[in-house]
Amino acid sequence: MKNVTDSFVSLGHWPSAGSFGFNTDILATNPINLSVVLGVLIFFGKGVLSDLLDNRKQRILNTIRNSEELREGAIERLEKARARLRKVEKEAEDYIVNGYQEIEREKLNLRNSIGKNLERLENYKNETIQFEQQRAINQVRQRVFQQALQGALGTLNSCLNNELHLRTISANIGMFGAMKEITD
């Protein structure tokens, strides 16, 4: 504390002008010494400070240039990615549309195929029914004919004697012979 008070006391006292030198006591220096020190600092420090500032400026400019290049590269990659995305979205949309169209086509083909199969089955069923009806009719006719024939033979056998029987057979043979000649 004593040094601080001594420094303030020495401010009021001017040293004698016997020699030129630097006073290292900052509080005891006069404005001329301060201006000389500041002038020397500015003269010599200006180049160093200017170099430091120029280096810093160059580093900042290089960083900005690199950032700009990186930004441009990122923008370019982003545009390429967007273009690929649009292309992929379009392809996906085309696949979806084509898929739906294919599904509709397959449904239509399936419906047509089912319709044709049903129609064939219906025709087969109708043909089978007709065939079975015709067969049943033929069986009924054959039974009716056999029964009628047996009934007629029974009636003829009971009603006819041998001579009448032989004449009827001869007449029938003659009729069948005439029919055969007509058909030939």
Curated annotation (Swiss-Prot):
What is its biological role? F(1)F(0) ATP synthase produces ATP from ADP in the presence of a proton or sodium gradient. F-type ATPases consist of two structural domains, F(1) containing the extramembraneous catalytic core and F(0) containing the membrane proton channel, linked together by a central stalk and a peripheral stalk. During catalysis, ATP synthesis in the catalytic domain of F(1) is coupled via a rotary mechanism of the central stalk subunits to proton translocation. Component of the F(0) channel, it forms part of the peripheral stalk, linking F(1) to F(0).
Spans through the membrane: 27-49
**What does the similarity note say?**
Belongs to the ATPase B chain family.
Protein name in the entry: ATP synthase subunit b, chloroplastic
Q: How does it sit in the membrane?
A: Single-pass membrane protein
Q: Subcellular localization, per the record?
A: Plastid, Chloroplast thylakoid membrane
Q: Which UniProt keywords apply?
A: ATP synthesis, CF(0), Chloroplast, Hydrogen ion transport, Ion transport, Membrane, Plastid, Thylakoid, Transmembrane, Transmembrane helix, Transport
Q: What are the GO cellular component annotations? A: chloroplast thylakoid membrane; proton-transporting ATP synthase complex
Any single Pfam family the record assigns to this protein: ATP-synt_B
Q: What else is known?
A: In plastids the F-type ATPase is also known as CF(1)CF(0).
**Subunit comment:** F-type ATPases have 2 components, F(1) - the catalytic core - and F(0) - the membrane proton channel. F(1) has five subunits: alpha(3), beta(3), gamma(1), delta(1), epsilon(1). F(0) has four main subunits: a(1), b(1), b'(1) and c(10-14). The alpha and beta chains form an alternating ring which encloses part of the gamma chain. F(1) is attached to F(0) by a central stalk formed by the gamma and epsilon chains, while a peripheral stalk is formed by the delta, b and b' chains.
Q: Does the keyword Translocase apply?
A: no
Its lineage reads:
Eukaryota, Viridiplantae, Streptophyta, Embryophyta, Tracheophyta
Q: Which organism is it from?
A: Nandina domestica (Heavenly bamboo)
Name any one GO molecular function: proton-transporting ATP synthase activity, rotational mechanism
